From Swiss-Prot:
UniProt-recorded name of the protein: Large ribosomal subunit protein uL13
Job description of the protein: This protein is one of the early assembly proteins of the 50S ribosomal subunit, although it is not seen to bind rRNA by itself. It is important during the early stages of 50S assembly.
MF-aspect GO terms: mRNA binding; structural constituent of ribosome
Subunit structure as annotated in this protein's UniProt entry: Part of the 50S ribosomal subunit.
Family: Belongs to the universal ribosomal protein uL13 family.
GO BP, sorted A to Z: negative regulation of translation; translation
Keywords: Ribonucleoprotein, Ribosomal protein
Domain of life of the native organism: Bacteria
A single cellular component GO annotation: cytosolic large ribosomal subunit
Region named Disordered: 128-152
Keyword Ribonucleoprotein on entry: yes
Keyword 4Fe-4S tagged: no
Length: 152
């Protein structure tokens, strides 16, 4: 028996929507990263984009456990000498783009490389309750009911 390799035409991508209101960021990001990679499917192939499309709504209403909301620090560098910039999840969630907290968490849970960048493109995060993907008829995932620790 030969090893099965998925072909491009055999990929079945589904659409899922997750309401992030009251959910813990790290647990949500780990779950979403698994769905984006397609590791929950029996036909998972590492070199193919066989993951699903994920829509996350209410991204500004996520929670952190412990003191991470005020004490966790996100770093980025401008590329110039002395250009190290710091921010906290509190500043990001109260800022102009609160959905970046979830995007940063999921992106850092994916591997590096061109395939991860392609998979990350299948993630759509919205800060409010509305999204523009009703035409795809996404299935709702109740992530909070999967484990009591998922919701705070």
């Amino acid at each position: 028996m030969k090893t099965f390799f998925l072909k491009e035409g055999q990929i079945d991508k589904k659409w899922f929507v997750i309401n992030a209101e009251g959910l813990v960021v790290g647990r949500l990001a780990a779950f979403v990263a698994t769905l984006l990679r397609g590791k929950h499917k029996p036909e998972y192939t590492p070199h193919m984009d066989c993951g699903d499309n994920i829509i996350i709504i209410n991204a500004e209403k996520v929670h952190f456990t412990g003191k991470k909301f005020k004490e966790k620090v996100y770093y980025k560098h401008t590329g110039y000498p002395g250009g190290l910039k710091k921010t906290t999840p509190n500043n990001v969630l109260n800022g102009k783009f609160p959905e970046r907290v979830i995007k940063m968490a999921v992106k850092r849970m994916l591997d590096d490389g061109p395939m991860a960048r392609k998979r990350f493109g299948n993630l759509y995060v919205y800060s409010g309750p509305e999204h523009k993907h009703q035409g795809q008829q996404p299935k709702k995932i109740d992530f909070a009911s999967l484990n009591r620790k998922n919701k705070k």
